[in-house]
Amino acid sequence: MGQKIHPLGFRVGITKKHQSVWFARFHKHQYAQSVLEDRFLRKNLLKLLPQLFQKKLNNSPNMPKISHIQIVRGLIPYEIGIQIHAQNCHMIKSAFEGLEVQPNFVHNLLKNHLILEKNSVKKTSLFKNAGENIELSLTAESTNDFDSTEKKRGGLNRKGEQSLNFKNSTKKTMKSNVEKRKKLFARFHQRFLGKFIVVKNGKKITKKFDSKKQLSFKNNLLSFFKKNLQERRTFRKNKFQTSFSKSSGFSKNQKNRETISLKQKAFLNFVDSKVSKANLSKPCTKFVNFYMSQTNLSFLNALKAEMNYWNQYFENSKTEEIQKFGSFRYLPLGSQKKWNLLRFKRFEKLPLPLLLKLFKALQQKALKKLERLRKEYLVFGKFSKTKTFSYYQRVRFLQNLKKFISLRKNQNSLNFSQSTFENSAQKTTNQKFALKVASLTEKSFQKKFSKIHEEKNTIKFIDHLQALVQQHRSKNLFLYLATISESRQNLKKIQQFTKQQSDFLFGISPKTLVGLTNEEKQEILKNKVSKTFFKISQKNASQKKNFQDIFVEQLQKQRTICEKNIQLTPKISIQFYSVKAQDFQTRASAVADSIVDDLEKRKAFRGVIKKAKEDLMRTPKVKGVKIQVSGRLNGAEIARSEWVRAGRVPLQTLRANIDYCYKTAQTIYGIIGVKVWIYKGYTKTRKPTANSPSVLLDLL
């Protein structure tokens, strides 16, 4: 017969089941344990839930029907989320009451029941007090505002005088800092930036090197020592005497020459060399500068003429359209859609910083475009009409965008000023809104606490599932050895960290514990730790928590996770999703279940498949169906597969919304496999919104 591969990854020997070998790679991402656990949970849930429904409801028409069970896993391996999609979800929780549980779980259940009842009593009292406090605060704040206005009219307190003195001192320090910065900038300008001149050509600003200005002594000295030794010697013999006699105020005797330092000699020599070089290069630089200035002027004049031409062209086309149609309908010929001004309607929803970024990016692109036009003009001496027209459109769009941003800024400033005036009125409205929220939350909590019995049943069911998973993990312990070792290592690290940072976390310094007995140390540690945890538990979500509180909470969570992983106990959460009757009929799992029931009742498979297909095609949402049945059909000796299709079922398109289910029917003749595909149209692709980046990509 050979070997078959199990869908989960087992290589199963048909004759020798004890020789089944695991061959898939499961060391990464703990794939083995998650797949086995999911399969195990799904099997148990599909067995257990129908039994509970029959006990409670006894085949009544309101009995909940499960469409499918989804198991979701988070990043943390011990967390398991179970999503049950079914009809009449409110009946499922009541059905958990008939679950037979071990006596150990009953003790935990009673504890949980007491905790829930206590919380219900506390929460109702808290919400009543909160409503009274908010009403009192409304009256108190009105009186406080009146008192504050009277204090402002009267004289200043001591605190006010101190604040004025502090403000004056801060102003003085600010002025001194500004003066210091100015001096530093002036020194920097003298030393380093003195050799550059800022030149403005139209709207373009550039920096040019000024050859007339003196170089710094350091640069001269470096360039001097780069010369050869022979050149230096000849340079000193020829130039030193003349330069020294003209510039220095010393005597011409040999004694004074010997006393002068080498640095001074080098400086004097290079001043003369610089003057001589400047005199030689003056005519060349003058010619180049004059030629470039003339070409730039001619380029700017030509570009202005082109821009004026295109501006007149736009105005003429606009007037013609207004005369014909009575409004400006169409852009002139050759204009691009992306530079259309109607685009600003989309920009209304965009935030202001994003618009500023867009403006800067477009400005840089426009400068690059201008540089290309200048190069083309230098080479050919003319402009291409299409390029100048595109540049004109870009510049026109930029000008309008600048105006649009300025308008947005003015609107924001006006809104801000209005909000400051309306703050007092907003406070009262906010407080009224808070009262409404408090009343609504109170009602919601009352609903929840009225259904404590159902919550108790769900806790019982979760405990039962946790016990089942723990048994499964203990059987397959070889798959969980790596997680256990990792969690032990993490626990040790957490313990070391808490010991090192005990002063920051709990306020326990090792110096205070010196010289005490072990019993006294334990008592002090217990008291400090219990106090910190009590403070953290008292703080609600509305109150702001310190960095210390958040750190302690996270450490406690990590510790519990590690301990649970070592004990092989998972954290299971159950969520119920109600499914409508129309949606339930078009689910592949429900259709497969109905086919399996009919086949197990020994009905003819062709009639069953045909009926299921016709019923599905009558529903409006379904656009295609395919049903396949394989096995010993109608008790035939040779197994075969038969399938029926209606409409379209595109199995290779990714956008197709196809619901699929596979189930087995256990008949007298053997197992019959049932596969159902239901095609419900294509999934909707999202259109680009105003906030999406695809709106701005074509501009850049």
UniProtKB/Swiss-Prot annotation:
Residues 88-196, 282-587 are annotated as: Insert. InterPro entries: KH_sf_prok-type, Ribosomal_S3_C_sf, Ribosomal_uS3_bac-typ, Ribosomal_uS3_C, Ribosomal_uS3_CS. One of its GO terms (biological process) is translation. It comes from Tetradesmus obliquus. Pfam families: Ribosomal_S3_C (PF00189). It is found in: Plastid, Chloroplast. One of its GO terms (cellular component) is chloroplast. Its main location: plastid. The gene is rps3. One of its GO terms (molecular function) is structural constituent of ribosome. This is Small ribosomal subunit protein uS3c. Gene3D superfamilies: Ribosomal protein S3, C-terminal domain (3.30.1140.32). CDD domains: KH-II_30S_S3. Disulfide bonds: none annotated. Part of the 30S ribosomal subunit. Keywords: Chloroplast, Plastid, Ribonucleoprotein, Ribosomal protein. Belongs to the universal ribosomal protein uS3 family. It comes from the Eukaryota.
